[in-house]
Amino acid sequence: MTRVKRGYVAVRRRNRVLERAAGFRGAHSRLFRPAKQQVMKALVASKRDRDKRKRDFRKLWITRINAAVRKQGMSYSRFIHQLYQSKILINRKMIAQIAVLDENGFTSIVNNI
């Protein structure tokens, strides 16, 4: 029976995991099993935080719009409702940017609803 040297594929898979674990501390960057666990944990955390970032920015935009709209004597929910009724299709990110950078422009949006 001929000798079988263990696989190119397995070595590549392990090296790929260890490359992803570069920068981790101790055994988490040097040994395959702890590195694999840490890489999986890091991927879960990065996915979770990408989703959380979307929620956080939406919260920030709503807070900024609410503060700017209350200066004009209106509530946030009434402002958004009137935007939809008047068919002005500006998303919250754009409205928040206008509110922060161009108060006169934001005032004109509020008055034109």
Curated annotation (Swiss-Prot):
PANTHER family linked to this entry: 39S RIBOSOMAL PROTEIN L20
Superkingdom of this protein's organism: Eukaryota
Lineage: Eukaryota, Viridiplantae, Streptophyta, Zygnematophyceae, Zygnematophycidae
Family, similarity comment: Belongs to the bacterial ribosomal protein bL20 family.
Annotated keywords: Chloroplast, Plastid, Ribonucleoprotein, Ribosomal protein, RNA-binding, rRNA-binding
Signal peptide as annotated in the record: none
HAMAP family the record matches: Ribosomal_bL20
Gene Ontology BP terms: ribosomal large subunit assembly; translation
Main location: plastid
InterPro entries per UniProt: Ribosomal_bL20, RIBOSOMAL_L20_CS, Ribosomal_protein_bL20_C
SUPFAM superfamilies: Ribosomal protein L20
Protein name: Large ribosomal subunit protein bL20c
Function comment: Binds directly to 23S ribosomal RNA and is necessary for the in vitro assembly process of the 50S ribosomal subunit. It is not involved in the protein synthesizing functions of that subunit.
Keyword Protein biosynthesis: no
GO MF term (any one): structural constituent of ribosome
